[in-house]
Amino acid sequence: MDVLELYRRTGALLEGHFLLRSGMHSPFFLQSAALLQHPLYAEAVGEALGKLFEDEKVDFVIAPAIGGVVLSFVVAKALGARALFAEKDGRGGMLIRKGLTVNPGDRFLAVEDVVTTGESVRKAIRAAEARGGVLVGVGAIVDRSGGRAAFGVPFRALLALEVPQYPEEACPLCREGVPLEEV
């Protein structure tokens, strides 16, 4: 599966000057929602990501809301597991709402569309572990961490992508006067 081509085909690979959640600037942004809005593409991505973890016995798949809800669902479907999501708790962390089942000892896979620092998925992991879940792996459509994201369990992605990132003070796009878009 050519993941980068799917991003291009669906208009999910944006070019310009972007302020990332990490505070870094980048000439590219991967708008995964534009890809995952297409059920056939979403399902194909979910199946491919699920295959990377098919040997793990996974009870549920969790992702940070809102962006990860679709991804959690399609990966869980591929693995025959439950699909959960974690929401912001208003205190800088995440929580799993009542009604979503996590049994003590349940094995889970955490997924994210794009991992840059891994902080969002870490918050979802902490929410699941707080309910007794046991993390067995982390999956992503795209790893743009440059190998810096580590979770203490297998971390696998469909695509490792080196995308330039700059702190504001060293950003060539700022120096060129390219308008900054917050994403």
From Swiss-Prot:
Annotated residues for binding of 5-phospho-alpha-D-ribose 1-diphosphate:
R21, K88, E112, D113, V114, V115, T116, T117, G118, E119, S120
Question: What is the protein name given in its UniProt record?
Answer: Orotate phosphoribosyltransferase
GO MF term (any one): orotate phosphoribosyltransferase activity
Keyword Transferase included in the entry's annotation: yes
Summarize subunit and interaction data from the UniProt record for this chain. Homodimer.
The record's EC number reads 2.4.2.10
HAMAP family membership = PyrE
Q: What is the lineage of its organism?
A: Bacteria, Thermotogati, Deinococcota, Deinococci, Thermales
Family, as annotated:
Belongs to the purine/pyrimidine phosphoribosyltransferase family. PyrE subfamily.
Q: Which cofactor does it need?
A: Mg(2+)
Q: Do the record's keywords include Cell cycle? A: no
Describe the function of this protein.
Catalyzes the transfer of a ribosyl phosphate group from 5-phosphoribose 1-diphosphate to orotate, leading to the formation of orotidine monophosphate (OMP).
Cross-referenced InterPro entries: OPRT, Orotate_PRibTrfase_bac, PRibTrfase_dom, PRTase-like
Cite the binding residues for orotate.
T116, R144
Q: Name its species.
A: Thermus thermophilus (strain ATCC BAA-163 / DSM 7039 / HB27)
Q: Which CDD domains match?
A: PRTases_typeI
Q: Which UniProt keywords apply?
A: Glycosyltransferase, Magnesium, Pyrimidine biosynthesis, Transferase
Pathway(s) per entry: Pyrimidine metabolism; UMP biosynthesis via de novo pathway; UMP from orotate: step 1/2
Q: Which NCBIfam families match?
A: pyrE_Therm
Reactions catalysed: orotidine 5'-phosphate + diphosphate = orotate + 5-phospho-alpha-D-ribose 1-diphosphate
**Matching Pfam families, A to Z?**
Pribosyltran
Biological process (GO) annotations held by this record are: 'de novo' UMP biosynthetic process; pyrimidine nucleobase biosynthetic process
Broadest EC class assigned to this enzyme: transferase
